[in-house]
Amino acid sequence: MTHAQIIASLIADNPRAKLAEVNLYAESFQQWQEATANIREHGAICAHPRTGQPIPNPYLTVQTAALKNLQRFARLRTDSLWRLDGEAQP
């Protein structure tokens, strides 16, 4: 199944609350990816824009918040909604 087919299946099989969860999961995953890429590029410590003093990269906070959202959905067992090659994941 393609990603689009999985989303279509989720929309058809789940009420609106589940659709909102799927959308939030996808958004959180995208935020986590972007934050991780920024941290890899600029490091965990960066310069303050006005003072130049070293500070923790603000994307660390974004990455942590997104990961917490992803973990929350793992507790809700949304992994059973996603399939690879038409097979349900255990």
Tell where the protein language model's regions lie, with residue ranges.
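Positively charged, polar, low-complexity stretches
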Residues: 1-90
